[in-house]
């Protein structure tokens, strides 16, 4: 998650010229159908059943709280997710949670259970390999919210343990860390060179344990260059400069755009920075020889309340627009909504309010919006292609 959207860069991010922007606009048939629907009063459900796109691999939910719930609740929530078209769940394989007691001790039970629950519902799993126990943390970070590994080799050993344990059971997708360009996830502050060293070591170890695995670089947040956090585009370019090419199969990205909608160009918007600004995530990938690789949106959403809240209607609109937009972009491999259920009701905590459901389990308008979009895809059986780790 990110705290604000005003993501600056070391140099100005310029808007791509109109002829290039045309490549990102919705297909004419979608626009025509939407206009017709508004004029005729036809529901959006009908409109979007007419548009089918087969190349997007996966729609999922990023749900860090699912692992904390009972097996019964997990089964119930996963069934509800699947009923609205969700086919995958993104979960933390938290090193600090599994090996908190030392390098020879493993507390696998909670992670084992949630992976079992997902597979029992026929859902694929994206495991985020992250976290760091105090005994393996870099000096001075062990007491931080997100301590960072002291040794890439030790982190790689952890990554190999995760891959060796879960790949034989069907997990094929591993994401290396979460938002490493944010101080909230990388202490004492983001360090592209240190992250890249961990990524390279983890990639090699995962591929030895599971050669067919899809390894995604840690989802980058559209932060500002404020002396602490690093803008996602700049961070990605620094990763390439530090030798990251060849050590990931896809780029992880979190294109949050609120309070704007995804299709509204804003130079600070994570969605716009994906490929509309100059430079952008895609332009950096292309200039470094990785145009053939995909971007995986491993988080996207908007808070319905709290200090950065956009309201329930705008939250629903943002998710609808993100899903529809992603289906029109060939280089997006998958999209994960953040998140299933509000984590609380704190008026001062924006993170509490991203759910499709309230903290009490009542569906918000965003639930219906996602259900409509993904239900349409499900009925065509074309929008969600292979489940790589089923």
Outline where the language-model segments fall.
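Substrate-binding cleft and catalytic face of glycoside hydrolase catalytic domains
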Residues: 84-225, 258, 291, 343-346
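Aromatic-rich peripheral "rim/lid" segments of glycoside hydrolase catalytic domains that contact
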Residues: 107, 180, 307-321, 325, ...
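Hydrophobic faces of well-ordered beta-strands that scaffold small-molecule active sites
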Residues: 57-63, 89-91, 125-129, 172-176, ...
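N-terminal Sec-pathway targeting helices
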Residues: 21-36
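Hydrophobic alpha-helical membrane-insertion segments, chiefly the h-region
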Residues: 37-47
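Boundary/entry segment of secreted carbohydrate-active catalytic domains
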Residues: 46-87, 92-94
């Amino acid at each position: 998650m990110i705290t604000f959207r005003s993501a600056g860069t070391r140099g100005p991010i310029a808007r791509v010229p109109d002829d290039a922007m045309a490549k990102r606009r919705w297909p004419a048939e979608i626009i025509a159908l939407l206009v017709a629907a508004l004029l005729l009063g036809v529901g959006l459900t009908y409109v979007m059943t007419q548009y089918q796109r087969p190349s997007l691999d996966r729609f999922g939910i990023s749900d860090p709280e699912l692992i904390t719930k009972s097996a019964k609740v997990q089964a119930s929530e996963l069934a509800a997710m699947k009923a609205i078209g969700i086919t995958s769940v993104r979960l933390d394989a938290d090193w600090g949670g599994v090996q908190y007691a030392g390098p020879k001790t493993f507390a696998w039970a909670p992670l084992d259970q949630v992976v079992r629950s997902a597979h029992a519902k026929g859902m694929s799993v994206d495991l985020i390999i992250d976290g760091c126990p105090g005994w393996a943390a870099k000096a001075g970070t062990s007491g931080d919210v997100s301590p960072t590994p002291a040794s890439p080799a030790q982190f790689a050993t952890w990554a190999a343990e995760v891959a060796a344990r879960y790949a034989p059971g069907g997990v094929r997708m591993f994401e290396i860390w979460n938002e490493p360009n944010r101080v909230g996830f990388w202490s004492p502050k983001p360090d592209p060179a240190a992250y890249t060293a961990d990524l390279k070591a983890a990639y090699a170890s995962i591929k030895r344990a599971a050669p067919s695995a899809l390894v995604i670089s840690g989802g980058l947040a559209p932060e500002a260059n404020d002396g602490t956090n690093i803008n996602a585009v700049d961070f990605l370019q620094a990763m390439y400069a530090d030798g990251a090419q060849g050590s990931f199969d896809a780029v992880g990205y979190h294109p949050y755009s609120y309070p704007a909608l995804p299709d509204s160009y804003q130079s600070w918007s994570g969605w716009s920075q994906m490929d509309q600004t100059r430079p952008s995530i895609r332009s950096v990938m292309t200039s470094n020889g990785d145009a053939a690789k995909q971007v995986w949106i491993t988080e996207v959403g908007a808070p319905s309340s709290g200090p950065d809240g956009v309201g329930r209607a705008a939250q629903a609109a943002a998710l609808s627009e993100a899903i529809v937009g992603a289906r029109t972009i060939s280089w997006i491999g998958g999209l994960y909504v953040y998140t299933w259920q509000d984590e609380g009701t704190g008026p001062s905590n924006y993170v509490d309010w991203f759910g499709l459901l309230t903290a009490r389990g009542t569906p918000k308008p965003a639930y219906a919006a996602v259900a409509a979009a993904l239900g349409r895809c499900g009925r065509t059986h074309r929008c969600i292609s292979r489940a790589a780790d089923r």
